Amino acid sequence: MSAPTITTWFYAERPGAESVYPQVGGRSSSTWFQAVYWRCVVCFFGASARVNPDARHRLYTNVDAVPDVDGFDTAAFLARLGVETVVLPYASEPPAGYYGAWANQFYVLDVVRHLAETLPGPDAVGMVLDSDCVFTRPAGPLVAAARRHGALTLDANVGPDEEQNGLTPRQMGRIYAELDGGGAAAGGAVPTYVGGELVAGTRETLAAVADAADGLWPEMLRRHAAGLPKFNEEAHLLSYVYHRLGIPVGTADPFVDRIYTWFTGSTVRPGHEDLMVWHLPNEKRLGLRRLFDAVGDGRSWFWAGTPDEAWRRRLGATLGVPGRTPAKWARDLVQAVRDKVERPV
């Protein structure tokens, strides 16, 4: 069986075409903002290379040249790890005014399409993860599960009336009913909001997901033009695609979780340290920034020895899993205040 293809992505927005990204803040076309994500990219591939040395690694982006960050030669680092960089245009870019935030998220649909078309064989597994995800263990069990199920999905544990990017699952269900031909009043079970931080599956299933998403996108554009409820971001749309294809929900839950580590609303808990992948939205400007320094230093603890339990404990202490230490709390507070001053508006 072929090695998995592990990918992440970054779409750099242009001046005048910015969107809103609340977890980072600031102007999305600025060097400051984009450096936050490039640091995440470095950490993503560094961690995966440590625990998945035999995997294929690929970066999708719209930039022609990967920039240096903080004086660090990002492109050379990725080349040393054997990361393939694919410059991919944004074919699924929503029109201006489609939704007020997260305008780059539909880029994932283009990434999934390209990934499905380039996997080497029918049993090959590819995965697309957000760049603020960190591998802590080898991906073998996740890959085996993807072959078994065809695709893996993460139940993001969003309540029926909890809004996620402008829609609650109950409101999503009304759109499902219309798309399924039953009309908005058809009712039915409230659907599960499937997290968009992971799209993983075999070549055949990823191709089916891409086909279904491509077929659905014109309807979303029509609804936008008509002022009708629509899927505002890729996770809304992919949740419906999984529903339509009969792909079960929650098969990725044993491997990955969305872990909030902010000063308020934290969801991190004991047991998270045992997961294969940590998705850490709140650590983009905090722990992942410090991890970037370690990953960029070939003599640091990050590259020393084998990625064993001691390595994972050091990783967890840096990223706040399974909890924030007093030292990390103090460093995070200082960084959060500094970011408020330095962040371009």
Identify the meaning behind each predicted range:
Residues 126:
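Short aromatic/hydrophobic "clamp" motif used to bind/position activated sugar donors
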Residues 1-43:
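N-proximal low-complexity "stem/linker" segments adjacent to membrane-targeting elements
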Residues 263-345:
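Long, low-complexity C-terminal extensions of enzymes
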Residues 47-55:
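Short, acidic, metal-binding catalytic loop of nucleotide-sugar glycosyltransferases
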Residues 66, 70-120:
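Active-site-proximal specificity loops/subdomain of glycosyltransferases
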Residues 135-174:
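Conserved donor-nucleotide/metal-binding helix-loop-beta segment in metal-dependent transferases, i.e.
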Residues 180-283:
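Catalytic core and acceptor-binding pocket of nucleotide-sugar-dependent glycosyltransferases
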Residues 131-133:
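Short acidic donor-binding/metal-coordinating loop in glycosyltransferase active sites
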